Amino acid sequence: MPRLREKYLTVAVPALVKRLDLKNIMQVPRLDKIVVNVGAGKATQDAKILDEAVNMVRDITGQKPVITRAKKAISNFKLKQNQAIGCKVTLRGDRMWEFLDRLISITIPRIRDFRGLSRKCLDGRGNYTLGIKEQIVFIEVDRDKVSHIGGLDICICTQSGSDQGTLALLEELGMPFRK
């Protein structure tokens, strides 16, 4: 069992029942999935950029990403319909818990000028989204193999349904929020 999941079951669940004043243990917010997305807009000119993004996401998550394609053509961006423009991975189960553990304990502290994550990145339905501007903060990414610095989006989806429940869950798991 992943370390963070064990912490969730033994420490976070009892604390969340008290903190959110829940009557049933099944009402406790829980993680559903984590989606890691990379938009490689420059891939329209150079296909090598998309290959790098796919390899980077595979190294970070340990799972093969799905290539995302343009839904419609936009001439101002020189974009054709069905052209590959990025990649994404949906993590569930043990891989999700292990990725979140590495994100909280290793990756986020390595971000330059880090002063805590914003509490405002919630969508009202219990999902927390954060953007990372440089992929080189991940220990799985080799700096020598990176030709261009790019970012990625991480969406943490919960079964909470409310921003308050999601924030409480992430704080109990050790997510470093701004004071």
Regions from the language model: what does each represent?
Residues M1-K179:
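Ribosome-associated RNA-binding proteins
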